[in-house]
Amino acid sequence: MRKKRSAPQKPKLTYRVNEQIRVPEVRVVFKDGSQEILKTGEARKMAEQEGLDLIEVQPTAQPPVCKMDNYGKLQYKLDKNEKDRKKKSKPTELKELRFHPNTDTHDFDFKSAHLEEFLRKGNRVRATIVFLGRSIIYKDKGFELVERLKERLSNVSNPEGEAKFEGKRLFIYFEPDKKKIEIFERQLAKMKPEEKP
């Protein structure tokens, strides 16, 4: 059995600090926003006296730009920001439900309610209308079903383009719309339990 290769990791963003900075002079940006070009050794001593580290933040500038800060705290803040960014950029999953051109009202309501739930959770959805055997001659029923789906899901999503045929299957994708979902959730919260869909 083969082992799966893991995706290459991005190199962690690191800065040169204190003795790692080996250029004759640097531009130091102070906490108040003022700047001054100093000899590297002199800037290092100033940072040491304040109990801080000299951190090179723009190594490509001429001379390189440094700031005085606590390196541990800076690294912690960067790691925290990276984690927050990863949380926010959670990849959306694609959920799919299948219909038939002769799907009855109860099945349509049941399946479209599931699609709506997936969209409210932030997932993309694909509705597939499967034409079995000779039912392909009823393409118009498939397109009617797509229009019903568009109408049913319009309060939480936007269709991605038009419905497309691929063999004996008709596909349409829906993308969640955060603003519409927020409005829908507020309306649901105002409803009495017996009025909720």
Curated annotation (Swiss-Prot):
The keyword Cytoplasm applies. Keywords: Cytoplasm, Initiation factor, Protein biosynthesis. Monomer. GO terms for biological process: ribosome disassembly. One of its GO terms (molecular function) is ribosome binding. The lineage of its organism: Bacteria, Pseudomonadati, Chlorobiota, Chlorobiia, Chlorobiales. One of its GO terms (cellular component) is cytoplasm. It holds the Pfam family IF3_N. IF-3 binds to the 30S ribosomal subunit and shifts the equilibrium between 70S ribosomes and their 50S and 30S subunits in favor of the free subunits, thus enhancing the availability of 30S subunits on which protein synthesis initiation begins. This is Translation initiation factor IF-3.
